[in-house]
A protein has these predicted regions:
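Intrinsically disordered, low-complexity terminal regions
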Residues: 1-253
Length: 253
């Protein structure tokens, strides 16, 4: 009788453990099918891995994975936590598979995005705000990057033209991104590192810092109030002299 009772208890315990294991979001992720999208917006500290594919889908796992809201409107995909779960997002992950080229990526509220493979396309706009992070390899002809309010961006790859604006404590590490022409505007404590062997137009103000790696044939440097523009080449401590540029930097606004 006791043996039978112990067997029943053991089977009941195994069933409970098995049920919890099946419901564990780390082992049984949520899968969402998606329509085509060309713009991505990520919020709430969600960690996203971009994966080029022949299908559109989101594999969601980690803590409170059921609280992620996936919304599509037109060509825009939004990923965010439910309002009541905004403070519990530290271990929530999304593997995002996509078919069409991504033209726009906007990151807010500590969200983080990285690329599984190079993003190859003609144009790309990246915005990172509010402590968000982006790390990836790009192969583009025209790239616009805007980083502010403590966000951090790390770029690799190649582009023909790079327009870069960094402000309010934002950081952009782009020394591994080869660019033929770079226009960069940094202010209010922003920090930038870029690479160029051709042409650089740099404007810094109010404590911003721009480090230039490579040997650009043309450097137009402009400083306002405070800031620094200097060479980051090995054994070189050159600081670019102040030269007023006739170019209009309003296009960065």
């Amino acid at each position: 009788m006791k043996h039978t009772l112990y067997s029943i208890i053991l089977l009941f315990f195994i069933k409970i453990v098995s049920t919890y294991a099946q419901e564990d979001p780390l082992t049984t992720p949520r899968k969402d099918r998606l329509n085509d999208f060309t713009q991505l917006k990520v919020y709430s500290g969600i960690l996203v891995n971009l994966i080029p594919s022949d299908e559109n889908k989101a594999i969601i796992y980690g803590d409170r994975y059921g609280s992620i809201r996936v919304r599509q409107k037109g060509n825009t995909l939004k990923l965010r936590m439910r309002f009541g779960e905004l403070f519990y997002y530290h271990n929530t992950y999304v593997d995002l598979y996509f078919k069409s080229p991504l033209h726009v990526v906007k990151l807010h509220q500590g969200a983080s995005v990285q690329t599984e493979a190079p993003l190859s396309q003609s144009k790309f706009l990246l915005k990172a705000h509010e402590g968000a992070q982006f790390e990836g390899t790009l192969e583009t002809e025209y790239l616009v990057t805007k980083v502010r309010t403590g966000a951090q961006v790390s770029l690799r790859g190649e582009t023909s033209e790079h327009i870069l604006k960094v402000s309010t404590g934002g950081v952009c590490e782009a020394r591994n991104l080869k660019s033929e022409r770079t226009q960069v505007c940094v202010f209010a404590g922003g920090e930038v590192g870029i690479f160029s062997d051709t042409q650089v137009e740099a404007h810094v103000s109010m404590g911003g810092t721009i480090g230039i790696q490579g040997k650009p044939k043309s450097v137009i440097a402009r400083r306002t109030i405070a800031g620094e523009i200097y060479s980051q080449n090995q054994n070189t401590n050159r600081s670019y002299s102040k030269r007023n540029s006739r170019r209009n930097f309003n296009r960065f606004n």
